[in-house]
From Swiss-Prot:
GO terms for cellular component: large ribosomal subunit. Forms part of the ribosomal stalk, playing a central role in the interaction of the ribosome with GTP-bound translation factors. HAMAP family: Ribosomal_uL10. It comes from the Bacteria. Gene3D superfamilies: 3.30.70.1730, 6.10.250.2350. This is Large ribosomal subunit protein uL10. Keywords: Ribonucleoprotein, Ribosomal protein, RNA-binding, rRNA-binding. Disulfide bonds: none annotated. Transmembrane segments: none annotated. GO terms for biological process: translation. Belongs to the universal ribosomal protein uL10 family. It comes from Photorhabdus laumondii subsp. laumondii (strain DSM 15139 / CIP 105565 / TT01). Part of the ribosomal stalk of the 50S ribosomal subunit. The N-terminus interacts with L11 and the large rRNA to form the base of the stalk. The C-terminus forms an elongated spine to which L12 dimers bind in a sequential fashion forming a multimeric L10(L12)X complex. GO terms for molecular function: large ribosomal subunit rRNA binding; structural constituent of ribosome.
Length: 168
C-alpha cells in the first residue's frame, strides 16, 4: 500500500516522539518470520513495555535524526523492525534475543543505548542489564551484607578488647 505525504509525516512524527522518550533501541530483520510469530512478538512487546514497529528505512532515518538513536542509521538496510524500550533499557534487547533463539530467521542487526552503537555480536551487554527492581534488590543485598560484615567485625573487636582486659 502506497503512503501519501501526510501518512509518512505521521509515521515519522510518531516514531520520533517514541524515540525521544525511549531508554534504548534494537533493530532487527524479520524476513522469513511468519505472521503468527510476529504477532506473538508484538504481544510480548506490549506486555514488556516495548514499542515495536516495521518502518521504511528512509522514514526511520528521518525519525531518529536529532535523537540518541541517530547512530543506528547504518543498520537501516533491508527490511527493518525497530523496537524502543520505554520502561527499562534491556527490555527490547532481551525480548529480541529470546525471540531470535526460537526463530532462526529473525536476525538482530544492532542496538543503541545512551547514544552508543552496539553491534549485534554485543547485544548481550544490553540484554543482561537488570530491571529497576533487580537493581534495587542487588543494591539492598549489598548494603545488607555490608552491615552484617561490620557487625561481625565490631563484635570480634569487642571480644578482643574483653580478652585483653582479662589478661591484663
Amino acid at each position: 500500500m502506497a503512503l501519501n505525504l501526510q501518512d509518512k509525516q505521521a509515521i515519522v512524527a510518531e516514531v520520533s516522539e517514541v524515540a525521544k522518550g525511549a531508554l534504548s533501541a534494537v533493530v532487527a530483520d524479520s524476513r522469513g518470520v511468519t505472521v503468527d510469530k510476529m504477532t506473538e512478538l508484538r504481544k510480548a512487546g506490549r506486555e514488556a513495555g516495548v514499542y515495536i514497529r516495521v518502518v521504511r528505512n528512509t522514514l526511520i532515518r528521518r525519525a531518529v535524526e536529532g535523537t540518541a538513536y541517530e547512530c543506528l542509521k547504518e543498520a537501516f538496510v533491508g527490511p527493518t523492525l525497530i523496537a524502543f524500550s520505554n520502561e527499562h533499557p534491556g527490555a527490547a534487547a532481551r525480548l529480541f534475543k529470546e525471540f531470535a533463539k526460537a526463530n532462526p530467521a529473525f536476525e538482530i542487526k544492532a542496538a543503541a543505548f545512551e547514544g552508543e552503537f552496539i553491534p549485534a555480536a554485543n547485544i548481550d551487554r544490553l540484554a543482561t542489564l537488570p530491571t529497576y527492581e533487580e537493581a534495587i534488590a542487588r543494591l539492598m543485598s549489598t548494603m545488607k551484607e555490608a552491615v552484617a560484615g561490620k557487625l561481625v567485625r565490631t563484635l570480634a573487636a569487642l571480644r578482643e578488647l574483653r580478652e585483653q582486659k582479662e589478661v591484663a
